[in-house]
Amino acid sequence: MAARHFLTLNDMTTAELEDLLDHASKLRKEWRSGQTRDTLKNRVLAMIFEKSSTRTRVSFEAGMTQLGGSAMFLSPKDTQLGRGEPIEDSAIVISSMVDAVMIRTFAHETVERFATASSKPVINALTDEFHPCQLLADMQTYRELRGSIRGATVAWIGDGNNMCHSYINAAERFDFRLNVACPEGYEPDQQLIEQHADRVTVVRAPEEAARGAQLLVTDVWASMGQEDEQKAREKAFRSYQINPALMAQADKDALFMHCLPAHRGEEISADMMDHESSAVWHEAENRLHAQKALLEFLILNRLD
């Protein structure tokens, strides 16, 4: 049987995604009640990091351990995909020794090429184009706190980046409307917008995007690798901050989410992390449980 990969949300059907999120919620309850699992006993996850991340490493490594398996960390010094050895050669060799491979890198093409040659499941833990693992955590969090997101309105405030792209995919998979508020020149990928034009609206005013929304989401103004653009981005995004005033435009029961790390005083006001609408800490923990469910699904080809 050919390996299943998770490079974008489109690699799973809506039914598969919803089953996975239900299982993730079950895993969260088990873990919080002290139950243990060994469904991935003696299984090994290779974690290739060309972009560093606290949450990604901790959640995947802890997740494999909690399921009875293990994870190995490979830094840029250990791998250097495509520099010296072709990506495809690395994929063939690494996948012959482990049970799954997680990659966090820059170019989305890197994970696509790796997956094509890999005999084991490949997980996109973030590229410059997509961040599907975070969307699993976000959708799990919304379901746990508010129920089904079907028919809801979600407002993305800020840069049309990889997180925004994954929210566009999620709008189709989970059947919600997405309003994207961003300054000119920072829009999401135009082809992606056109493919989902029936669900996605791009506007300039954050207030317009947030009006009546059930979920407000944002990310940093300058992502990793864009540090030299920081000043220009601060100027462009100055009015694209999620704060209590913007939350007041949303539905009275609206949630606020952020994938972290958050820059207080920039994309969010200092008081938003602990605002009554904030689901950020719940969302952050769910990276662990959503990814455990994903690992079981891909490695075992089932959800126990």
Swiss-Prot record:
Pathway: Amino-acid biosynthesis; L-arginine biosynthesis; L-arginine from L-ornithine and carbamoyl phosphate: step 1/3
Binding annotation for L-ornithine: N162, D219, S223, M224
Catalytic activity from the UniProt record: carbamoyl phosphate + L-ornithine = L-citrulline + phosphate + H(+)
InterPro entries named in the record: Asp/Orn_carbamoyltranf_P-bd, Asp/Orn_carbamoylTrfase, Asp/Orn_carbamoylTrfase_sf, Asp_carbamoyltransf_Asp/Orn-bd, Orn/put_carbamltrans, OTCase_ArgI
One Gene Ontology biological process: L-arginine biosynthetic process
Compartments where located: Cytoplasm
Residues annotated to bind carbamoyl phosphate: S53, T54, R55, T56, Q80, R104, H131, P132, C133, Q134, C259, L260, R287
Keywords from the UniProt entry: Amino-acid biosynthesis, Arginine biosynthesis, Cytoplasm, Transferase
Domain of life according to the entry: Bacteria
Any one Gene Ontology molecular-function term assigned to this protein's record: ornithine carbamoyltransferase activity
EC class of the enzyme, as a word: transferase
Any Pfam family: OTCace
Gene Ontology cellular-component annotations: cytoplasm
Entry EC no(s): 2.1.3.3
Annotated function: Reversibly catalyzes the transfer of the carbamoyl group from carbamoyl phosphate (CP) to the N(epsilon) atom of ornithine (ORN) to produce L-citrulline.
Family under the similarity heading: Belongs to the aspartate/ornithine carbamoyltransferase superfamily. OTCase family.
NCBIfam families recorded: orni_carb_tr, PRK00779.1
The protein's name: Ornithine carbamoyltransferase
Organism: Marinobacter nauticus (strain ATCC 700491 / DSM 11845 / VT8)
UniProt gene name: argF
